[in-house]
């Protein structure tokens, strides 16, 4: 599944399903998931629920951080209702943690000094619900990227410390099976 901003259709958030055969790929029909301008789209797959989760900035709603669950059927995709995970401008990087079956969305929170922040969510049916956001970096950050490391069973977040000489920085964290809090937050290791 490829999610993108369609500049040819009012910058609407759009997704399309691709099917790989050998070294070729073919696509179904594009589907609009957000009928407003979007940006910073990030997609991950929840293998437990067999759903796609798309996180994005919704320019039609003050660039709020928003997520939506997609269900793939054949070469088509349908969507549930979009959910705001951050009521401020937030450029997301979405990953899936199979050990806790949670979606992790990392972002710089414009509503809180651009601090590095994580929203942890769980998919149920065609919807997603989020715990309270957790701040992992009390410094202004930007250009956040994230990936899940299977061997470490942890998420690695890379970002630029715009509030500290623009240093490239990485942070490693693990979700607890319950809500992420200062008590069960495991291991910050930073580089930069």
Task: Give a label for each model feature.
Residues 28-33, 78-84, 131-136:
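A short beta-strand motif characteristic of beta-propeller blades
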Residues 11-12, 115:
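Polyanion-engaging groove/track-forming segments
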Residues 8-10, 26, 78, 111:
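Hydrophobic, proline/glycine-rich low-complexity stretches
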Residues 4-6, 16-24, 39-51, 56-60, ...:
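Extracellular receptor-binding modules and their adjoining Ser/Thr/Gly/Asp/Asn-rich linkers
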